Amino acid sequence: MPTTIGRGISNIMRHGTANFGITGTDWQEKINWDRLRTYRLESARARMKAHGLGAMLCMYDENCRYITSTLTPGWNRLKPGLRYALLCGDAAPVLFEQGDIGAQIARHSPWIPEENIRYSYAWIKGAAGGASEQQVTKFTNAIVEEMKRFGVAGEKLGVDFIDINMIGAFEKAGIEWVDGMSAMMEARSIKNVDEQECMRIVAAIGDAAHWETMKFLKPGRTENQVTAHIMQFLFNIPGLEDVEDVIVSSGPNTWPNWRNFTARIIQPGDIVFMDLAALTWNGYKSCYYRTYCVGKEPTQEMNDTYEQALGWLYDSIEAVKVGTTTKEIASKWPSAKEAWGYEEEDQAAANLWGHGLGLAQYDPPVISRIWSLDHPIEIKEGMVFALETQHGKTYQYGVRIEEMLIVHNDEVEIISNFPVEKITVVDPM
């Protein structure tokens, strides 16, 4: 049904909730994981072909997972080359796993053909020192052999990561490498019904974490204690794989918002905001801010500031619909100069912001006045993204609010359900 939150809301919005639980049963289909895996693989393949690529080399965690549906452990992340995947033509993906871990892949992920499980050749971004050239040569030769095996040798190879070692080795091997990240971004931007349900569950976990934050906050706690408590809360949830950050900022740390936490003691009357920056459930990630006032009622000035930020947020949500563009959304926000007196939009980067959510915290579209006004991206059915706004008074207080949403053909589904209409007041005196 239509919402009345914010100012000037006229389009159809609804709040959506998770449809199913997070554990498996024999009497409910819930999320169809096989359908999800097939959708992701074939979406990547379709975009690969649309870009004229014979093969796609995926070294970033989110892309490797998208095409193989295998897990990158925490110690392995942000180290392109420890594990990677290759998609060639119409073939099943080839997974290059570190060492003998491939034996576990064969057991846990049987949709990867056993003959397509290989061991990787890593140089760890050059940390192998003088051995890097040796390793990248072996790496390159293995890629060439797989492209030959699947009949795409000599065709363009899309890559989502490149470094100086790879450039030289690819040139020697005669590999024509081109941008492959754009194709993967396009594929990841549209979520099927199963991915959408994953995101509803992610948001439901976020709702619970904010409720737990509300109960745990009190004067005398420190920011890092709140972060630690919510981390522990989250990692007790089945299917929870990772939390990139639980941002907790209080008092003068809230403006400018430095997106961090410290050992600062929270005091009566402090504004505190918490962001679930990429809690990760079965690979899918959140971004979810809420603002609290601890120990006292917020001042009228604080409430007015919050109302301004809330208006900016819901004005931008109102602009979301299939067929419009990121320009129309970003245009709902004031310029950096109008809002804060900055001379350039980049000075306010991420203050008024939108970004896709999925296997990465930054799937398309990414929305900002920095680029969206001149480089608009069309909003499509199946996109899942967050919109977030903030405002404040330097070194005194700041507020930040964020909603996660799914774009449907005829409506916008808001999946973050912790109350947002006003600052959440915790234990006022």
What is each residue range found by the language model?
Residues 1-429:
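Active-site neighborhoods and metal-handling regions in enzymes and metal-associated proteins
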